[in-house]
């Protein structure tokens, strides 16, 4: 199989007429690489040649999700196998040609054994023996042994073998699309080259800009209105809203297959409503150039001369300066370089300014590493080089740094495509993450500093599909290794989707239930949601509510959302017929909607940033850019600001506003200590959390603050103490950890993982030995309680393998918990674990039903080089006997060279019902 060369592309375009986005690679996450998720109007198979055969539209509801074909070729020398989207858009349209065979007198040749002349797919690749993404071919849950996977719209040209007169087989909807809840395809076989022409959009989009708001379903108290649309802008990938209500837009035209559409480069636009009617009527180009092609993030700080605009455009992060305040860039600086693959949506995303004045951002799993403006690798505060090589970080990450790029921190890692990070007024971080397409695993995360979020195996880097002990029953949870110790739980899983922009709503214009909620865009299912968050043990729980549902306009592709100065929401709409495979179906359209209470007129509160008083007042704004501008202004007059902020801090009734004032005051020179002391005894648990975070930022006796808060009655405060212990060694720190472990409540996974984070040492070292010793000294037999067993399960110290094996021998520990403990052994020192397991297997006394489950798992973790005599040999034989006919049986026999069972391997390989994989390994 081959991919198209450049020389092929003109022919492909001739075949597919006006169809766009050819040659896409698999893997999607957001924007135009969104998860092949949502149906949208696309191409109609109106062709220059009539097909010999056309199927009915195949959907999830079609019996067996497939139909047969048997076509007389009529002497043709070539055939074209065509898949179109069935007329409802190309979202989720994964298609399979199942065991197609050319037949004739004395001729029978499988198509998969032939080389095709050309092959194209609108998303992913045309592949033999694999689906369009490279996964297993499956139709209606059944594996396809010999077939071709593709994705609508697709054309495959094949020469007919000599003597062949018929083509026979089946066609079907691949599970990769069907399992996302959508997908509809139509198949056709031609004997002349087809020309697929674009058709006029059907119901579901596009609609005229003026009709767009009526297509969105919003809560009954709210309304959607149009703030801006084409021709004022097109294809907004990301937005920010400044203190004057201007909307700053990354306008993307030069994206992937269309990367040369605009020779002068993509643009950073500034949209403004000059007459106050709630509709933008002016557009200005702040910057245009090839260096911002396919920019994915924008953040605006300042509201006049000296304005800074951070633009994320992999592999670079630029800071543009508007020195004179005329809304045109005067100069450009590089902040970070070599940060992600260019033209890829899994690379570097938008920046956000926290209430502490520091800058936050993230990248997905094509971000790879961060380098400074000179191209030198960044080393973070923990002493680790910031890259995804597994030492210790993997895949997507979340970051924090000073505005000059110094004091760099990795706050979380092992995400797939965490699209943006939102920081609330307490300094708590939130984001979404996209699954591998088709696995119903999109998630919302509370980012616990230092956390591993489980996209791949933390130690091996293997994907979630690789078999492992204590495997999660549901694929959406298995996708994130949620049963593994060391993986922070998800706040919420939202099913299939294509998550994009996110913010925290801290205004008062929307109804009360939205205050403090996350507002999130999911472009695949055409929806903007609110996630109403509440405390849950040491972490959080959330419930979802739709804020804007585009079910009536399938072109609605929300790419970002911001809170405007008046507290309304502004939603950027990429507006495109489909999502998937780095494709882009439209380059001319784009919208921005305003969502607000019914009848609420657009307004822009005025702030006087020229005075300290005015800047402090601006900290009450629901708009993030306004608050960032205020923080920057206050830092210029620290003495006057300190006096005024100290007075203001005692006045606000709103908890979040008070937190912002505290951050602003504590961030001034010499003011952190008093602010921390003031907040440590605050009645609001969130303010006590701010106290500790501020103490750490300013390095004002953070360990003293931890000692005080280690016995706090609030579990979230204690969690924050654990997180703060990360990288802090010594007897005092170990004693704090021991108190936290002793207070652990069984079943609180957030707290369990915080305790694990607390044992991470600097430079990828471990603090577990000191932590465990301090705890065991005070807990007595507490490590055997349900809560204590969770701490042991999470631990990774020198004592951990022995403690885990002792628990496995405990009759109070059931089979299910035993499997979790066995999985924990995979994260221990291998030599120490093997010794402990060898002793356990030799001496364990447990019911047969428990032994039959755990022995096969345990013996595979023993090093055969240490000898396998006596009782241990008996247990190994028993382990093999417990799993006959399975891969585990094969593995045990081969690992320990059980000669007495060698013949059983041969029998197993030849037995009916043995899977191909097991049969092959049995005789390997």
Where are these regions (language model features)?
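Bacterial Sec-dependent signal peptides at the C-terminal "C-region" and cleavage site
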Residues: 33-47
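N-terminal secretory signal peptides that target proteins for export/translocation
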Residues: 1-18
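Beta-propeller domains with acidic blade repeats across secreted/periplasmic ectodomains
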Residues: 195-614, 635-636
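Long, ordered, helix-rich scaffold segments
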Residues: 572, 588, 595-924
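Gly-Asp-aromatic-enriched flexible segments
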Residues: 43-204
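Bacterial N-terminal signal peptides
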Residues: 23-35
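Generic recognition of flexible, low-complexity loop/linker segments
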Residues: 69, 156-158, 213-214, 236-237, ...
